[in-house]
Amino acid sequence: MAASLQAAATLMQPTKVGGVSARNNLQLRSSQSVSKAFGLEPSASRLSCSLQTDLKDFAQKCTDAAKIAGFALATSALVVSGANAEGVPKRLTFDEIQSKTYMEVKGTGTANQCPTIDGGVDSFAFKPGKYNAKKFCLEPTSFTVKAEGVSKNSAPDFQKTKLMTRLTYTLDEIEGPFEVSPDGTVKFEEKDGIDYAAVTVQLPGGERVPFLFTIKQLVASGKPESFSVDFLVPSYRGSSFLDPKGRGGSTGYDNAVALPAGGRGDEEELQKENVKNTASLTGKITFTVTKSNPQTGEVIGVFESIQPSDTDLGAKTPKDVKIQGIWYAQLES
């Protein structure tokens, strides 16, 4: 009996060992197949991961792409700074502007410029007589606002401003009679054209000042070296404009704040807010002729205008705005 059991045990031993070996071989093959599936390769008691290599290559490509993007961004910055460094475009004559196409003018700032004169004399050389001024153009080159300085207790003075409006502030296509007297005096009366433009500038302290650049109802007379006159400055807002509380001059609510019984001292302030005032104010402008060409009928010069800013329909005290620039006109007999 013992002998038979020993023989059975002896016969069972190889089978057990063989089963373990087969199982180990199966596990090894499975591990190898899984490793190949995930890109793992056995090599000299260590595994090298091809996936890790791919990740390194991907990271290197991302780094190279970032370097290229940074270089492109720096190049764009240089291009932009170079464009800004060029400043305003070259001033062209009237014929040069007319010879350009829309796409050649678009985005260059030329449409906001007054033409210049090629040739001529540095004085007003037109003979006495009656002319018709057309293509009258006024291009501001400087906006200053009279206000208190940034420093404490500084006296009010004309402060430099930052323009907040796009290049749409030039007055153009103005026309009217232009007369040259025998004594050398000139007279110009504005009749028609684009004679107003809404402009907003910002003071150094951050306050924004809107105003209506205009020369409405202008009748200027004097010597060509300096002829000036007062002109009309309409309200920046019309009577039908509604404020945030629905109050207007000719429409909207009469008031949006309950009026107190009185005696508080703020009745005047409440009245300014509730009762809208669209009355026009006045400004003064001075023209100076710097060059003329009687053969082409062109004349150019400089101007200085001082006019009030927006009053917010009577709620604010207007500020003085000084506008300096150049002007151009064509005179036809």
From Swiss-Prot:
Task: Tell me the SUPFAM superfamilies matching this sequence.
Answer: OMPA-like
Q: What is the similarity comment for this entry?
A: Belongs to the PsbO family.
What span is annotated as the signal peptide, if there is one? none
Cite the InterPro entries for this sequence: OMP/PagP_b-brl (IPR011250), PsbO (IPR002628)
List the GO biological process terms.
photosystem II assembly; photosystem II stabilization
Q: Where in the cell is it found?
A: Plastid, Chloroplast thylakoid membrane
Predominant subcellular localization, coarse grouping: plastid
Xref: Pfam families: MSP (PF01716)
| Transit peptide as recorded in UniProt | 1-85
Q: What does this protein do?
A: Stabilizes the manganese cluster which is the primary site of water splitting.
Give GO terms: molecular function aspect only.
oxygen evolving activity
Descriptive protein name: Oxygen-evolving enhancer protein 1, chloroplastic
What are the entry keywords? Chloroplast, Manganese, Membrane, Photosynthesis, Photosystem II, Plastid, Thylakoid, Transit peptide
Q: Which GO terms describe its cellular component?
A: chloroplast thylakoid membrane; photosystem II oxygen evolving complex
